[in-house]
Amino acid sequence: MNGIPDLYAEESYLVGFAQDTLANDWRLAQVMEVKREFERYPNIEFIYTDGKGDTALQVLHIEELVNRGVDLLMVSPREKSALTDIITKVHNKNIPVVLLDRGIDGDGYTTFIHPDNRRIARAAAEYLLEVLNNRGHILMLVGVPGATPTIHRTDSFTEIMAPHPSITITPIVGNYLRADTMLALEELLEKGLAFDAIYAQSDSMAAGARMVLRKRGIDPGSIPIVGIDYIREAQQAIRDGDQSISFTYPTGGKEGANIANQILNGEEVPKEIILESIKVTRDNADMVPPIF
């Protein structure tokens, strides 16, 4: 009736996502997955920012989102230590914080949603030890230094390799980007680097490496290549024999949006949520859908 408020109207909320970068296809897919899932909740307005791979800019964006009055912050921190202070401050203001994929130091957040990077890295190492017969030179394509997935994908891999003196590892930083990987690999190959296998901490970097190999007249299928994420490009490469295996690495966008809705509704949520990862080979590539 006129003048009488709707006592049953849902409370409206503003959720902000401070993303590290949208130049990376996996990170863009993560934001879009969150956006699509929030469409199920008409009382939630969703906004996001592009940190352009700049830690200081991501910090600034978090501050701007808080100033805009977000009811919940979602963030995938570019660097663990550098983002800890600002994220903890937001959490201490009683603004819920959902971390997607990447963590921080301490427990200044509401929930952390991610696959198990340590387990993935150990499985990748064990696979390469088997195919290389415990000896050889591995090129390790490293993601963003300082990000928790990079730290875990590096440390757990090298821990498995450490007891094997006939294994050597050369790391190069590709920042999870094709272009950065191509530049770094071209530079190494110009210096005469030879290697027996590639451990790529993302399938985007594996794709960049394959482009360089082909340019040099090297068949990617002649070298064991391990990737992580299992994007459509990796699925096709595995089918074609140009990549050995990959591990699915879901973005957690859907789970993040649903957890955010639960938090805003006053529900208790776990401090940590581990997402499943599947090892994909030529045998099951047709049965496992790529993450995007």
Functional labels for PLM-detected ranges:
Residues 72-91, 156-157, 170, 174-236:
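Hydrophobic alpha-helical
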Residues 80-119, 137, 143, 230-240, ...:
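Flexible loop/hinge segments that line or gate small-molecule binding clefts
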Residues 1-13, 141, 145, 149, ...:
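Hinge/cleft segment of the Venus flytrap/periplasmic-binding protein
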Residues 38-51, 137-140, 158-178, 220:
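Short beta-strand elements in bilobed, periplasmic/extracellular small-molecule ligand-binding domains
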Residues 8, 15, 58, 113-138, ...:
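Hydrophobic alpha-helical segments within soluble ligand-binding/sensing domains
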